[in-house]
Design a protein with these regions (language model features):
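Substrate-binding/active-site clefts of carbohydrate-active enzymes
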Residues: 1-25, 47-53
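Non-membrane alpha-helical structural segments and their capping/turn regions in soluble enzymes
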Residues: 10-17, 41, 140-144
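Active-site-proximal helices and loops of the catalytic beta/alpha 8
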Residues: 21, 29, 34-119, 136, ...
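Short acidic/polar active-site loop segments enriched in Thr and Asp
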Residues: 29, 156-158
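Surface-exposed cleft-lining segments at the edges of enzyme active sites
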Residues: 131-135
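Hydrophobic targeting/anchoring helices
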Residues: 146-152
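Short acidic/histidine-rich active-site segments
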Residues: 159-166
Length: 183
């Protein structure tokens, strides 16, 4: 849990950098950084810059929920990509479930402007309900158009979450999500 890490100590920063460089040295090509809005921005900028000095192609993907912070996290702090949770995902989920017009996706992309290439579009992740679950769409086929649209109609990257390609329904879970403990 990132809230328990004491970022006020320089030793913490150095240890975090050591860990990042260790994994990069083994060939890991990037990190997904959880809830970046809760981590001190000064630390994030320093970490990203420090890792990229040695591994310039290393990728940092951030999970941020406030669209008003997207520009800062990409242009100022150095993230390569951000999950477009508050834009693409929230809109497309409502479109799939019949609660919004697909036109809003175009408005979202226009709003993001030059940041669109730094977005990571997705239909599922560990925090969200599975498309095929009864808590979401109830069928993976209901997301075909959204998948096609999200992957092909702009220059954002697209993430497939493990099991999504198989139509995983997560019906073993009470909330339509897949647990890391599911077998």
């Amino acid at each position: 849990d990132t809230l328990k890490i004491d970022y006020s100590k320089r030793e913490t920063w150095d240890i975090m950098l050591e860990i990042a460089l260790f994994w990069a040295s083994l060939g890991v090509d990037g990190f997904r950084c959880d809830m970046v809005e809760l981590v001190p921005q000064e630390f994030l900028k320093w970490l990203i810059n420090s890792v990229k000095k040695t591994y310039p192609s290393f990728i940092f993907i951030g999970e941020a929920y406030e669209k008003s912070n997207y520009y800062k996290f990409i242009r100022e702090l150095g993230f390569d990509y951000l999950y477009d949770k508050s834009g693409f995902y929230d809109i497309v989920r409502d479109v799939i479930c019949g609660g919004r017009s697909a036109r809003e996706l175009s408005y979202n992309w226009q709003e993001l402007g030059g940041l669109q290439g730094n977005m990571l579009n997705f239909l599922e992740n560990h925090d969200e309900q599975r498309i095929a679950s009864s808590a979401f769409a109830g069928s993976p086929q209901k997301a075909y158009a959204a998948l096609t649209f999200g992957a092909l109609f702009n220059n954002a990257s697209f993430m497939l979450y493990a099991g999504q390609e198989l139509g995983e329904s997560a019906e073993n879970g009470a909330d339509g999500r897949t647990s890391i403990f599911d077998s």
